[in-house]
Amino acid sequence: MTTPPVPGQPQPPSHVLRPESIERFDRGNGVVTIPFVGKWNTTGNAVTTGMTVFAPGTGIPLHSHNVEETVLVFDGEATAVVGEEEFELVAGQATWVPAGIPHCFRNRGSGSMTIYWVYGGRDVTRTVTATGETFEHLSDRDRGATPAS
């Protein structure tokens, strides 16, 4: 027997998350995020997870978060900038980025590139390095994918 949902309250997701049935968050310019677990669908999560798919030649501007993040290159080829260092990554390789450290990921390949990300917290913010602007992760202001440079 299941408990009826409380109107206006987030509900736990299925124990099996199927990307094809999850509403996508379009960041613009060929970058799309598939949010898995977060405060939008769970009440007690301690992490926030999802996948982001990058078209060839796209990326997300240099930014930082208020919580740590690990990113796994799930498919394709990426350039990762973490702090002052730049890394070339392929599928199966991952990064760990402490809170407050500027970073970004760009698709350096000729096909799509997909990352799987995990944030170490429920209330995640993004601060754009170039402007200092801070906003809630996956809010309407969290768009603005750019061509890779």
Language-model features, listed with the residues they occupy:
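A short, N-terminal "cap"/entry segment at the start of jelly-roll beta-barrel domains
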Residues: 1-46, 130-149
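Conserved short histidine dyad/triad with adjacent acidic residue
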Residues: 33-37, 50-65
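Well-ordered beta-strand scaffold positions
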Residues: 52, 77, 85-87
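A short hydrophobic beta-strand segment most commonly corresponding to one strand
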Residues: 52, 96, 111-126
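A generic "binding-loop/recognition-motif" signal
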Residues: 56-58, 66-67, 85, 101-102, ...
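Short beta-strand His + acidic residue motifs that chelate non-heme Fe in jelly-roll/DSBH
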Residues: 60-62, 80-81, 97, 103-109
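Glycine- and acidic-residue-biased ligand/ion/polar-headgroup-sensing regions
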Residues: 68, 73-78
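Short acidic-glycine-tyrosine-enriched beta hairpin
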Residues: 84-99
